[in-house]
Structure formats: C-alpha cells, structure tokens
C-alpha cells in the first residue's frame, strides 16, 4: 500500500475516534467502511461514486444488492460490509422498541420505522402486534410491493394477531416517493383491516406512512 494511502487512513481513523461520526462528512464515513472491504486501494473515488449514485449515506446502505453490484468498483466484499452495517443499524433500532410499551417508546418506534423503511425504493408493509398492556410483542413484514403499491390481505393480518395472542396492532408502510400523504387505496385498505380487526375484538391503534424524513399518522390526521 502506498504511504500516502496508509497515512490518509490513519488520519481519518484518528479523526473518527476523536470527534466521532459528526466530525466526518458522508464520503469520509463511507471511506472508513470501505477500508475493510478494499484494504490496499484509495477508496475515496468509490465513496464519492456511491454517494453520487444513491444520494446520501443512508441510501447507500439501504440500496438493493442488485443496484450496488452495478456500480463500478463494488464487489462482493463491499456489498457484504454495507449490508452488515445496515443490518446492525436495524437490529439496534429494533432492540429499543421490542418488548416495550409503545406509548413510552413512541419516538424510538418512529426512529425504527425510519431506519428500516424510509430509504427503500419499493413499498414495504409491516405490522406491529401489541399485547393487552400495549407492549410490542412482534414486528413482522407482511408484504413487499412496487414503487407505489403493496398487496395486503386484511384477513391474514387479523389472523396473525390471533396466532400471536395480540390485542392490538399498528400498521406501517413506506412511500418511496418521500411524500407520506395517503392514497385512496391506503385509506380503503386501512378501513378493511380495521373492520377485520373489530370483528375479532382487536384494536387498530394507528397506521403510519413513512416518508423520506417525515411520517403521517392516520390517527393524528383523523383517518382513524
């Protein structure tokens, strides 16, 4: 490895350890990740290329494997390390909300939703199942869809609640466009799930739509 690359890596690591992530712009933080994947090359051009391609650090981590593989210079090692980092972030955020009362950890729940869903390029539909004390007992992905639609089956959602011995649930899905405004199909689907829940004595607390940097609550906006 050329000495200038070795010295640059050393300085960057020292800045990170001294000032934390806040001391580094996105491309330098991404460089730190790439140091492990590509141990003997200058990774700054690749870091900048990834950011130019996907937009920001979060979108690089959450980019589909197929799209990452299309970027020149990205191999299996890079993809693996990026996806390990993404999975770690998801797991940390999830740990803050599982087996906890939703009301007391609402901000953490929203953070988890944004971490796992805000930067997806296609729609994903999740259900949070709660017990009688409103403790989150299960977080399950029900369906994945296209850029503007995800198929959801109300009876399956309600049936799964009974299997888990849940008493209430919260629906969550993302809008890849970044705008969390509900479509008419979102409203209609929520109404069908609410009816299925009521028929079984279940409570639908809310339906959250996750945008790029903001969420919409059906309950707060009067849709429920």
UniProtKB/Swiss-Prot annotation:
Motif (JAMM motif): 173-186
Gene Ontology molecular function, alphabetical: metal ion binding; metallopeptidase activity
Signal peptide: none
Domain MPN residue range list: 102-224
Coiled-coil stretches: none
BP terms from Gene Ontology: proteolysis
Residues annotated as transmembrane: none
Domain of life according to the entry: Bacteria
Binding-site residues, Zn(2+): 173, 175, 186
Keywords recorded for this protein, A-Z: Hydrolase, Metal-binding, Metalloprotease, Protease, Zinc
Intrachain disulfide bonds: none
Keyword presence, Transferase: no
Family: Belongs to the UPF0758 family.
Family matches, as NCBIfam families: PRK00024.1, radc
Protein name, as recorded: UPF0758 protein SPO0054
